[in-house]
Amino acid sequence: MRKILYSLSVLFCLILSSCFGDLDTMPLDESQLVTENVYSTAEGYTGVLAKCYASLILTGQQGGDGGDGDLEGANEGYSGYIRLLFYLEELDTDNFLMPSTSNGLRQCLNLQWDAANASVVTWTYQRLYMTIAYTNEILRECTESKLQERGVWDALKDDYIHYRAEARFIRAYCYSMLCDLFGSVPYIDENTGVKDIPQQWSRKEIFNFALTELQQIENDLAAPGENEYGRVDRVADWFLQARMYLNAEVWTGEENYQKAYEYAKKVIDDGHYPLASDYRHIFLADNETCSEIIWPLVQDGQHAQSSTGTNFFVKAFVNGPMDELYQTGVGSRGWGNVRAKTTLVDAFDADDVIFNTEDTWGNQKKDKRAQFMTALPGQVKETWDENMAMTSTFTCGYGYIKWRNVTKDDQLCAAGDTYTSIDFPLFRTADAYLMAAEAILRGANAPRSTALDYVNEIRERPYMSDKYAQAGIRSDVSGKINESELNLDFMLAERQREFASELVRRTDLIRFGKFTKNNNWDWKNGERTGTDVDDKYLLFPIPESELVNNPTLKQNEGY
């Protein structure tokens, strides 16, 4: 069942041609996307829904980088949503470095982008609106009257409410990300006409729309744990509401930490997605068995190939020689691109950072989240060369190796090592624990002891202490902290340890007031140890191409 939804997406990709030019927020013309052939069967509708999901991790119509990509004029290998979000949410923070100067990566690394000099920013904007266009399409076509008219009502009458709710959920997620990244953006829905010029909504209006959608569809989504793998249910809805409420003060100017706590607590208390027994299992090729993942974006080495999903999170983070030190799952295919910044390394105890070739899973570390490569010849922690300059030398900086294209028993998966089979955990329960704890520290009505319990639950797991202890794995040091250690600075550091590379770091730093100022890291503002930058970088600019095609839009302040 794991890959059925995404296999359907591949099947219908050839019918659902999806190239986009410059008018990225314009609604799709029916002749471009929709044919009666697509909607003549129940499977056709399922395929369109699958395309909505798959557009967040796949890139085109042929798999891999085989051409016929979704975005016209974009590099298919670069332009998948998850990879793009890494550049916008991780590369410009205290987590990771890539030395590349192509497609705006150096501008992202240095926090020196503008409306025209960073293709990856433009492609992220386009990707989100492309997915919104797909969801609008199925919402137009998946109505009771059209199902009756096309003779598929009997086949879909029990499912179409779920299909519509899931499409609205995906659309709400995309708008929440546009709200986060770009602020005030154009609004389109299923009623926007082909010739209509999309109107720009304020950041608060976009926020309120997405939140209202989540509230309206909650009971139309599948009950917790009742949907097939890869599709969302009510727990995903609660999770996204918690995330939006937690960021509401930044995004709208009005805080609602009480609601953030309540919805995060619902995710925890529901119990359908309990924490995995081993942190490391969340990022492996058989992570479809991992109970913690609420919303996985499905990747498969045979049936759902992409160089932009978890394929990137393995290959870009390793080089060929590393496969001789441990089982990367991609053989010698590593690209040798991404290194950890010194600030990420320093978030862990120095003893835990060191890679032991006799203990490649880190079983004898205290904190098993400290998954670094330090054993390459000449490897150093610093991300600069002997002249204190930026360098492409992969051993200037430690590797980060929590993503591995192998199974829990350290075996290659059946799909092989050309592409990865690791599903990306877009939402997972550990985040609900830390969101709830943070909301309490920010004023939600719950005891501080509850926040402490939530944080300690998250910390016990990677220390494998107390109830998480397993034979043969070090568990003599508890991960628990005491009440006096629990504060917002600790929460920000803990989120870095728990979620590094999981596409939330920029959002976290902004929420804690530590993104543009009051906190520096390698190469921020182009300086080796970092300096403050202008507050305009709290938002990305509306792409210049979008402003040209829709002159009614107003650019974000400072660009």
Question: What kind of feature is each model-predicted range?
Answer:
Residues 16-18:
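C-terminal motif of bacterial Sec signal peptides marking the signal peptidase cleavage site
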Residues 62-95, 188-191, 221-239, 246-323, ...:
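Short, surface-exposed recognition loops and adjoining beta-strand edges that mediate ligand/DNA contacts
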Residues 179-180, 186, 247-253, 442-445:
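Short coil/turn linking the two alpha-helices of tandem helical-hairpin repeats
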Residues 41-42, 46-50, 54-60, 92-181, ...:
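Conserved, well-structured interaction surfaces
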